[in-house]
Swiss-Prot record:
Belongs to the DapB family. The gene is dapB. (S)-2,3,4,5-tetrahydrodipicolinate binds at residues 156, 165-166. NADP(+) binds at residue 35. Catalyzes the conversion of 4-hydroxy-tetrahydrodipicolinate (HTPA) to tetrahydrodipicolinate. One of its GO terms (molecular function) is NAD binding. This is 4-hydroxy-tetrahydrodipicolinate reductase. It comes from Azotobacter vinelandii (strain DJ / ATCC BAA-1303). NAD(+) binds at residues 8-13, 98-100, 122-125.
Length: 267
């Protein structure tokens, strides 16, 4: 059995991860960690997730449960994830990271840690989204420079980073297929007298509203026709199941920085 720990276990995504780890053959939830100051520390993690008692209590510190798991799944905040990354690197524990909003310097810290431990890091763990990334690469290569490309994403009102990590990853895939540098061609939102659109631009638009789990659409717009590749998530379990799948896949892997394209065999 692959022993799995969930960071941020008292949150919405954490609860979904607990459920997914409980359901997956070959996986077992053996540790759950929340904030040190949480009043829920000590509560059974299964009860937190609506799964009934499972005999795993919520801990307030990762360091106190290092002997209870093989791989940590972390969907939290960059500051928290980087602290956990250092602990796992020192302890030789594998990680699955779904946290978004890392700076370029913070991304380099992931690269450095992956020299010592195996890590799956992805902006989105949905199988459908990762299939879309493959389709986007193909669409960009076929349609080339004859279309205008726009990326529109929508999430719930509580999401703190924009554009989403998934939207940015989609932009990276498209830009790479076209030989463009996303940092140079990306336009984030438009307002006022912007002037005519240039062909090489890749535009991003963001919506934050209600309880939207995650919608992403990439438009390839030409004269007379438009191709749209869309993914809509209706449940966090989509991401949770993908993360647990990645945790199982990591068993026996060499230290390296992997993503869901590796897990799904799409490379």
């Amino acid at each position: 059995m692959r022993r799995i720990a969930v960071m941020g276990a008292a949150g919405r995504m954490g609860k979904a991860l607990i459920e997914a780890a409980r359901q997956a053959p070959g996986a077992g939830l053996t540790a759950a960690i929340g904030r040190p100051d949480s009043t829920l520390v000590g509560v059974d993690a299964g009860e937190l997730a609506g799964q009934g008692r499972i005999g795993v209590s919520l801990s307030g510190e990762l360091a106190t449960v290092l002997d209870r798991f093989d791989v940590l799944i972390d969907f939290t905040h960059p500051t928290v994830t980087l602290k956990n990354l250092d602990i796992c690197r020192r302890a030789g524990k594998a990680m699955v990271i779904g946290t978004t909003g890392f700076s370029a310097d913070e991304r380099r810290m992931l690269d450095e840690a992956a020299r010592e431990i195996p890590i799956v890091f992805a902006a989105n763990f949905s199988v459908g989204v990762n299939l879309c990334l493959k389709l986007l690469d193909t669409a960009a290569r076929v349609l080339g420079d004859e279309v205008d490309i726009e990326i529109v994403e929508a999430h719930h009102r509580h999401k703190v980073d924009a554009p989403s990590g998934t939207a940015l990853r989609m932009g990276e895939v498209v830009a790479s297929a076209l030989g463009r540098d996303l940092q140079k061609v990306a336009v984030y939102g438009r307002e006022g007298q912007t002037g005519a659109r240039t062909r090489e631009t890749i535009g991003f638009a963001t919506v934050r509203a209600g309880d939207i789990v995650g919608d992403h659409t990439v438009l390839f717009a030409a004269e007379g026709e438009r191709v749209e590749i869309t993914h809509k998530a209706s449940s966090r379990m989509t991401f949770a199941k993908g993360a647990v799948r990645a945790a199982l896949w990591l068993e026996g892997r060499d230290p390296a920085l992997y993503d869901m394209q590796d897990v799904l065999g799409l490379r």
